[in-house]
Amino acid sequence: MFRGASAINLDAKGRIAIPKRYRERLHVDFNSQLVITVDFDAACLLIYPLEAWKAIEAKLLLLSDTQGPERAMKRLLLGYAHECELDSNGRLLLPPPLRQYANLDKHAMLVGQLNKFELWDEAAWQQQIELSRETIQSDAFANSERLADFSL
């Protein structure tokens, strides 16, 4: 499981170094095989171990090619999906279209989301955190049935 937020940098070639605390697990459990794609709801990237991504592809395969919203989701997630492997230094090369989608330049945040990572531009991440705080304090959050009994 991946958790925590790490400030990282992109190098001049568009590579990121995955923090050391995740590298061994990615290598041993997932053979360093990853898939990077875009988030359809935010300007960030999603990084999945290949095995987890295969389960998502199976769900996408069930979606229609003739229904607009389903086709749009398939087009976005699969069209940007890029299979890659960690290099010997624990780095991933982010293709230019993915960097552009998430407005990634130099400073980024790698955020563990249990089964995947999100990769954000650092400034966009700070804005997202503020929006998340506002959402948590809103009536919509308080009225959510799924969160009614959630406590820490």
Curated annotation (Swiss-Prot):
Subcellular location: Cytoplasm, Nucleoid
Domain SpoVT-AbrB: from-to ranges: 5-52, 81-124
Pfam families according to UniProt: MraZ
GO cellular component, one term: cytoplasm
GO biological process: negative regulation of DNA-templated transcription initiation
Molecular functions per Gene Ontology: DNA-binding transcription factor activity; transcription cis-regulatory region binding
Chief location of this protein within or outside the cell: cytoplasm
Keywords: Cytoplasm, DNA-binding, Repeat, Transcription, Transcription regulation
Transmembrane segments: none
Family: Belongs to the MraZ family.
Quaternary state and interactors: Forms oligomers.
Name listed for the protein in its UniProt record: Transcriptional regulator MraZ
